[in-house]
Design a protein with these regions (language model features):
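Low-complexity, acidic interaction segments enriched in glycine
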Residues: 14-118
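Aliphatic-rich helix starts adjacent to a transmembrane/signal segment
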Residues: 1-6
């Protein structure tokens, strides 16, 4: 389930970036083109290509929960680590956008890879 949740979020992040590149999502020139938060993927954004901007684009129905995260009391979005576009893969940090997500859960998968590295 972790792999599926990661794939769902990463696919939505890529779709958002693609919509920015196609001019369907308004953004500032200096922005990376990735959303400010995972919640933006659920809340949606106005379709800039729609003549009256009444059409919205949604990328997720809801933010999936990290199935390995130990605390069930936190909201789904807070169960993920978020990496900004400006941070490195080796040392992911939050920032002005969400470029990628990773598991915050301790532990290692059956494949020997820590959940954080999936």
């Amino acid at each position: 389930e972790l792999r599926l949740s990661l794939r769902e979020i990463r696919t939505a992040l890529d779709a958002y970036k693609q919509a920015v590149e196609e001019g369907r999502v308004a953004h500032a020139a200096q922005d990376s083109g990735y959303p400010e938060s995972l919640q933006v993927l659920v809340d949606g954004v106005p379709d800039a290509s729609s003549p009256d901007r009444k059409k919205w684009i949604y990328f997720l129905r809801q933010v999936p929960r990290d199935p390995m995260f130990p605390d069930p009391s936190l909201p789904n979005e807070e169960t993920w680590g978020k990496r900004s576009y400006a941070s490195s893969h080796e040392a992911p940090e939050e920032g002005d956008d969400v470029f990628d997500v990773y598991s915050l859960a301790p532990g290692t998968g059956l494949n020997g890879i820590p959940y954080r590295k999936w």
